[in-house]
Amino acid sequence: MEMREKIAKAQRVVVKIGSALLTNDGQGLDVARIGLWVAQIAELRAQGKEVVLVSSGSIAAGMKRLGFSSRPTQVNELQAAAAVGQMELVGVYESHFEKHGLCTAQILLTHDDLSNRRRYLNARSSLRTLLGFGVVPIINENDTVVTDEIRFGDNDTLGALVANLVEADLLIILTDQQGLFDKNPRDHQDATLISHISASDNRLESMASGGAGVLGSGGMLTKVRAALLAARSGADTLIASGREENVIVRVASGEMMGTWLQPEHGRVAARKQWLAGHLKSRGALILDDGAVKALRKEGTSLLAVGVKDAQGTFSRGDMVVCVDLQGGLVARGLVNYSVAETLKLLGQPSSNIGAILGYKGEPELIHRDDLVII
């Protein structure tokens, strides 16, 4: 299926809009521009598409209302600005959507909400119900309570996690650039826009790790990482300029603009989709070459015999990452043994587990049902 056709057929779309596209150069919200975004989303809804909006802007809005002339540096002041600004942000959205006969819902999330399986399922159920009622959910990070997300977090990652959560067909990330370039366009006049790239392309891995100097500032770096995260659950991602007229409608109709990042694989099963988007790992298992091959080629469970080392502070049931001998990410999964137990089992066949630990638990460190290959 060609790009145009595949994108145009997307029925569940997540749209992420950053602060720079929602504000008047940091001087509060651009109410008129927000009205244009809302009109485009309303048009997608009129076409029968379900839309989830991931929107920044609460801190910028709160800064103006609290009288800050520049972005505060104190975390408590950022939290206060987020709390005040979120009220205005949601109010502006609600008033604009109401003009189009659409109902909205505010949802504030943290990474913890999506890394805990029970809370993840509750959030997914709520969002599915809202979409079933024709509501447009407006999602933001709960900056008032999550200090590290204010300092270092980004809504690109949140957009990818939400795409994972609602099993979206398409994630649209709007930015101040035309898309992803083969070189940093700020430094190289001959930089060429990458119109299409596969999530398995080695160039993306280099970009996502901060290498090659292609992306310049961290803004585009987070978008590449978000696209790779969305790709794990089978969602397509389009990175496009939010300055283009009617960009959301044009992109969703399949118009060739921006950069299309295509997932390597189709949608994964629901549990593995959660595992793929689970961010907070408690440790790492270092695998030998044989174990890496078995996981990638044969889809087996991870056995202790193929593990060279264990790092971190994980307990039974925690998320860990599996890496090869060079440190490359291979898989994520829920481990059956604590780090102390795992260290005792390194390189041992499953038949020795009972004798080593004094009890016989599961024969594998990570069962294949609790493992997702990256």
UniProtKB/Swiss-Prot annotation:
Annotated EC: 2.7.2.11
Membrane spanning residue stretches: none
Pfam families, per the entry: AA_kinase, PUA
Q: Which GO terms describe its biological process?
A: L-proline biosynthetic process
Q: List the record's Gene Ontology CC terms alphabetically.
A: cytosol
Q: Sorted alphabetically, which PROSITE patterns does this protein's record hold? A: GLUTAMATE_5_KINASE (PS00902), PUA (PS50890)
InterPro entries assigned: AceGlu_kinase-like_sf, Asp/Glu/Uridylate_kinase, G5K_ProB, Glu/AcGlu_kinase, Glu_5kinase, Glu_5kinase/COase_Synthase, Glutamate_5-kinase_CS, PUA
Q: Which GO terms describe its molecular function?
A: ATP binding; glutamate 5-kinase activity; RNA binding
Tell me which family the UniProt entry assigns to this protein: Belongs to the glutamate 5-kinase family.
* Name by which UniProt lists this protein: Glutamate 5-kinase
Query: What species is given as this protein's source?
Result: Marinomonas sp. (strain MWYL1)
